[in-house]
């Protein structure tokens, strides 16, 4: 396993209103190119132990235009959640391949979760890497804590039934990423 970056940076918190929900049929096209803020319901805040076969925990993404995406709305589609940071060299190394996969597979939902950084630095990174997928702002580290993420990059692969199929801590090579995505398609 490649080394992962320590997740110890901090940033300000943010939350949003409850508004119109998104339908899974609208994804990933309508979900992309936004910077939703992560929110974890109080009843779901207990960290999980990452293991294959366990259910993915509940979380919500709140977009700046008021749209809300609940993690349960992702059922029916394969999902990759990638935890990363702009200051993390291994995250930079793997991002081009993740973006390539997001562009190549319209059925795959990729959520790029930035941990504890501000919007402007994240926006610059997203533009530099041509990130077409949603770049989730986990400014308080709620999703990081919920998924028990210890270092970055870490990728979680969730099947269409909402179960964690696998996860990887460290840089994913193109062949490793292909293999893990094959398991959830």
Language-model regions, residue ranges each:
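N-terminal targeting signals for export/organelle localization
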Residues: 1-55, 180
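A short beta-strand-turn-helix
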Residues: 50-53, 58-79, 103
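Conserved redox-active cysteine motifs that mediate thiol-disulfide chemistry
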Residues: 75, 83-100
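Short pre-active-site segment immediately N-terminal to redox-active cysteine/selenocysteine motifs
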Residues: 77-79, 84-87, 151, 161
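Hydrophobic beta-strand core positions in alpha/beta domains
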Residues: 80-82, 112, 157
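Structural microenvironment flanking redox-active thiols in thiol-disulfide oxidoreductases
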Residues: 92-129, 139-146
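Thiol/disulfide oxidoreductase modules built on the thioredoxin-like
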Residues: 124-132, 138-184
